[in-house]
Structures are given as structure tokens and as C-alpha cells.
């Protein structure tokens, strides 16, 4: 059964990466959309099936302005697919922890941080700093680390959900990986009965990425940073 495969592979990957939870999705972009939907819908069966027809008061997703990029599609489009409304913090060339916090309102549902070469690199707060802001305001932190090589650091830095591409650094099939805190990952998995149905990943993608992660964790790394 597909649900059993999703659960078993997720548990196995989580154990490999020493994280609370993990699930395979169709791609990193789907991971963003489903993560946003997850923090909005949570356990609501009504919102799960009526995400785009029911007004949601607390639907703002705050991210640094310099992270609002087009990576092949706009970040804002993925946020909107998940039912969120994008709110930019800071400026195109800088965003501090204080500027991020200043953009938070009672309508804020989550903080989104994009770790990518597409983004502005200088004068931007770190994932660790974003995590501190998120904790202070009792908000989840979602980190899109699609092409990043390190499968541990962003989770350990305090992110509640971290999204990776299965086909980039991991060199697996076209797929995505979402890791994070148990409750948030479970909410992402629920989206298979919501917007995630249109982003469904097949058995081949799930098993292929699982095998690719096994290999990735044991293979000798040739990092561009070396």
C-alpha cells in the first residue's frame, strides 16, 4: 500500500539523517507548496479539502526580500499554491533579524528562508538567526535548501521543515525530500489528500530517492568548497 511505503521510507530516511521525520515528495518546489499548506491546514479536514475556497486569516509567509527569487518559477507562486500570502522583510540588499521580526504580524503563519545561489548573499541573516526569530514569535521556520549538499545543518540550526531536491546534490531521481519535526512532517504528508494530490510522487521516485540518499551518505564527497 502506498501509505505504508511513504511511512516506512520516511521513517528509514529520518533514521539515516538523524531527524524526527521525513517524507519524499515529487520535487523541491512541491515541497515548498506542501510545506506552506501544511502550516496553514494543520489537522483541519475542512481546510485540507477547501484550502483555496476558504478565507484563511493567518496565511502570511514572511521571507527576506532578497530571497524572493525566480528559480525557474517564482517562490511566490509556490507559496500561493500552498494557500499562503508572501510578505517580504527587509530590503533587496539586506535583511537583519530585527527586520525579519518587524514583518511579523498576528496574521503570520510561518517564516520562509531560501538557501540558494539565486538569492542575495551579503547582509542577510543566517538560518540560525531566522530560527531564533521564529522561536521568539512561536512560528515554524521553513528552509528551502533545494540544491544544498549538507543534509543535516539546517535542521540542526533550528528549522522545523527543510526541503531538498532529490535530483541535485543527492543525484537521485526527479523528486524532493522534506525533513523536520514530526508534527510538521505529518502535516506535509496529509497534503496527499489536498493540494499534494496534483504533485503525487510514484513508488519509483520514493524508492529511487531512498537508495540515492543511502549512497549519498556513504560516498566520498567532492565538494566545490574544497
Segments from the language model and where they lie:
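Conserved PLP-enzyme active-site core in the AAT-like
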Residues: 1, 7-217
Amino acid at each position: 500500500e502506498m501509505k505504508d511505503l511513504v511511512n516506512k521510507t520516511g521513517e528509514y530516511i529520518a533514521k539515516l539523517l538523524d531527524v524526527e521525520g521525513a517524507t519524499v515528495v515529487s520535487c523541491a518546489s512541491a515541497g515548498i507548496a506542501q510545506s506552506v499548506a501544511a502550516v496553514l491546514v494543520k489537522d483541519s479536514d475542512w481546510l485540507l479539502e477547501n484550502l483555496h475556497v476558504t478565507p484563511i486569516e493567518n496565511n502570511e509567509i514572511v521571507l527576506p526580500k532578497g530571497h524572493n527569487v525566480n528559480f525557474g518559477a517564482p517562490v511566490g507562486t509556490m507559496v500561493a499554491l500552498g494557500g499562503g500570502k508572501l510578505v517580504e522583510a527587509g530590503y533587496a540588499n539586506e535583511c537583519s533579524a530585527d527586520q525579519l521580526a518587524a514583518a511579523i504580524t498576528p496574521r503570520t503563519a510561518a517564516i520562509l528562508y531560501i538557501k540558494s545561489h539565486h538569492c542575495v548573499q551579503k547582509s542577510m541573516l543566517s538560518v540560525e538567526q531566522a530560527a531564533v526569530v521564529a522561536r521568539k514569535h512561536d512560528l515554524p521556520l521553513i528552509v528551502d535548501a533545494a540544491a544544498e549538499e549538507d543534509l543535516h545543518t539546517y535542521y540542526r540550526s533550528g528549522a522545523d521543515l527543510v526541503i531538498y531536491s532529490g535530483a541535485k546534490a543527492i543525484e537521485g531521481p526527479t523528486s524532493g525530500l522534506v525533513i523536520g519535526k514530526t508534527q510538521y512532517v505529518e502535516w506535509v504528508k496529509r497534503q496527499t489528500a489536498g493540494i499534494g494530490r496534483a504533485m503525487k510522487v510514484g513508488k519509483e521516485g520514493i524508492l529511487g530517492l531512498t537508495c540515492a540518499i543511502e549512497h549519498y551518505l556513504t560516498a566520498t564527497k567532492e565538494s566545490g568548497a574544497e
